[in-house]
Amino acid sequence: MKPIKEIADQLGLKDDVLYPYGHYIAKIDHRFLKSLENREDGKLILVTAVTPTPAGEGKTTTSIGLSMSLNRIGKKSIVTLREPSLGPTLGLKGGATGGGRSRVLPSDEINLHFTGDMHAVASAHNLLAAVLDSHIKHGNELKIDITRVFWKRTMDMNDRALRSIVIGLGGSANGFPREDSFIITAASEVMAVLALSENMKDLKERLGKIIVALNTDRKIVRVSDLRIQGAMAVLLKDAINPNLVQTTEGTPALIHCGPFANIAHGTNSIIATKMAMKLSEYTVTEAGFGADLGAEKFIDFVSRVGGFYPNAAVLVATVRALKYHGGADLKNIHEENLEALKEGFKNLRVHLENLRKFNLPVVVALNRFITDTEKEIAYVVKECEKLGVRVAVSEVFEKGSEGGVELAKAVTEAVKDVKPVYLYEMNDPVEKKIEILAKEIYRAGRVEFSDTAKNALKFIKKHGFDELPVIVAKTPKSISHDPSLRGAPEGYTFVVSDLFVSAGAGFVVALSGDINLMPGLPERPNALNMDVDDSGNIVGVS
C-alpha cells in the first residue's frame, strides 16, 4: 500500500482538506466539493448486476477492477463504494471490499470499524430514540401516542432476537412499557439521510424532517419537534466527510455511507459521487444487488437528488448465476450445464431490457470463474451479441487491471451524454409509481395492496407525501417479491404489504414480501472463521 498522502496527491488534495486516519486512510472535508463547482464533471459509470446468487456475483470486485483498468488504459478514474456493514461481514455475506487482485485496502479495517461512520450513525439514531422516550417520561408535552411510535433502535449487528422487544419494564422510573424493536444500522433513515445530504445545512434540515411518531391528535411528530437535530448533526460532524482509500493497484477509492439496496436506496453518498466526478475522467460507482433494486433506485431517485445521470451502465453477470436462474442446484453449480444456462439467460435479458428503458448504453461484464467452461462463456457472449449489447469477459479477480482491459475499452466506447429518462413522474400518485415499477421492472401482471397498505396510502395522501419518489423494499433473490421465483418471472401479482414515509430521506418505502430490517446470523456465521494473532494480524475477515 502507498501512504494515503500519495493517493491524495494524485487527486490534487491539499493537507487542509485531508484528515488522516493512520497511514492508509483519510477523510476529505465535504466542504471541498464547493471549491470544485466550476470544474467539468467526468463520466459516470453505473455498475449493477443480474439477480445474484447467495454468494454474490462480484459486482464490487468488478467495480474496483474496472476503475483500475480504466487507469491502465490512460483514463483517470476513481471508484466510489458503500461502506461495509459489520453485521453481514460477521454473518453470511462476508466483507464488501472486493476480492482477489481487485480489492480496496486496507481491507480488514474497512470491513470492520473503518473511520467510525457506522458508529456515528448508530449513535445519532439511538440519541433520537433515547430523547423520544425521555420526552414521554417527563410530561410528554407533544402528546406522543406511545402506541404509534415509529422510531426504532439500531445496532450494526445481525441479531434476530432484537426484532421484537418490550422496553420500559421495571416500574415507572424506567419509563412506560411499550413494544419496540432494533434495526440494523444500514437500514436506519439516518444512514439514508447522511448519504443524501450535500452539506451540513442540508443534513440538519433532513434530520429535522424525520417522522418519529403520531400524537394523540393523530398529528405527525418530527425530529424538529423534539429539537434534537442539532445534536444528531454534532454526532455526524465527521461522518459526513467521505473516506479516501486505495485499490490494490493504487487507484483512489472513495468509500462513504452504506444504505442497503433492498430496504433503502443502496448506493454510496452523493457527496462522494459528485466529488469523484469533479476529480476524475471516469467515476465508477455501484448500486446494490441486481438492476431491479439498486440500479432502478439510483436512476429514479439518487440521480434526481444528486443532479447527475449515468453515461453508461455495466451489467455484471456470471455463468454461475445464469445457471442458477435456469434451475441448476447450487451444489452442482460448477458443472457444465448449457440447458440451465440457456434458461437462466432470460434473467440477464430482463435486466438488460430494463436498463435500456432508462436510455443507457450497456456493457455486459461476464465475470469469469475458474470453473466456467469455454462452451458456457461462448454461449453467453454469443447471446449478448445477438441482443446488440457490448460484452466483455472480465478476469479482474485473478489478474487485476490486466484482466479488465477489454471491459474498460468497451466502456469507453459505450459512454455517451445521455438524456435522462425516468420511469415515473414525481407528481404521479404513489400507487401509480408502484404499479409502474412492478410492471415495467419486476414484470408483474398486476399489483395488489393489502388493507394495511391501503390505510398507509390514505396517510400518505392526507399528509402531502404523494409526490415523493418510491423505494421498493423487496427480496434481492428474485426479480419479483417472491425469493423462490428464479429466472424471469412475469405476469404474477405483486403484493404491497405496507408503506411508510422516510420524510428526512425524502422517499416513500413500499414493502413487498418478507422483509426484515434486522437480519439474523446463519448457523455457521463468518465470525467463526475470524481470529487475531499476538502480533495483531487478522485472519478470516476479508
UniProtKB/Swiss-Prot annotation:
It is an enzyme of class 6 (ligase). One of its GO terms (molecular function) is ATP binding. Its EC number is 6.3.4.3. It catalyses: (6S)-5,6,7,8-tetrahydrofolate + formate + ATP = (6R)-10-formyltetrahydrofolate + ADP + phosphate. InterPro entries: Formate_THF_ligase, Formate_THF_ligase_CS, P-loop_NTPase. Pathway: One-carbon metabolism; tetrahydrofolate interconversion. One of its GO terms (biological process) is tetrahydrofolate interconversion. ATP binds at residues 53-60. CDD domains: FTHFS. Keywords: ATP-binding, Ligase, Nucleotide-binding, One-carbon metabolism. Pfam families: FTHFS. Belongs to the formate--tetrahydrofolate ligase family. This is Formate--tetrahydrofolate ligase. It comes from Thermotoga sp. (strain RQ2). The lineage of its organism: Bacteria, Thermotogati, Thermotogota, Thermotogae, Thermotogales.
